[in-house]
């Protein structure tokens, strides 16, 4: 297996995008790219080549950079099966219980509805890294747009476990 190097990129007024690089094959992913430009600037600064776009849900502040990045780098877009028709450029659909091999790093996929119906989270056990989009924030959870409060509560419990 492979550990992740993680770079946080602040975007917009209150978003964060994450660049991840796994140590085995050197694959580089971006989690929830709201905008392409800050991602491209950071990739250039680090000398990394993007291979994957990893989405947690369909909202534009998490997918807005997908198409530009996919066109520029020819990368693979992965995201929730339930949001397939709402995420531009998606290539691989994931759902609860799936594992996703990102180079030599393995992500466990969990459905985490509440903020949106199709929301998923990625847990990289070896790196102890969780990418959960708008399910969980430092000071609370995301707003409930499409799901229910019960779903959000269950999703938070799932992440806690």
Walk through the language-model features, giving the residues of each.
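Extreme N-terminal starter segment of soluble prokaryotic enzymes
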Residues: 2-6
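Conserved hydrophobic/aromatic beta-strand scaffold that supports enzyme active sites
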Residues: 8, 17-19, 30, 99, ...
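Short acidic/glycine-enriched loop/turn segments that link adjacent beta-strands
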Residues: 13-16, 116-117
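Divalent metal-coordination and catalytic microenvironments
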Residues: 20, 32, 57, 69, ...
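Short, histidine-centered active-site or binding-site loop motifs used for metal coordination
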Residues: 21-24, 81, 135-137
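A generic structural signal for short coil/turn motifs at secondary-structure boundaries
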Residues: 28-30, 140-141
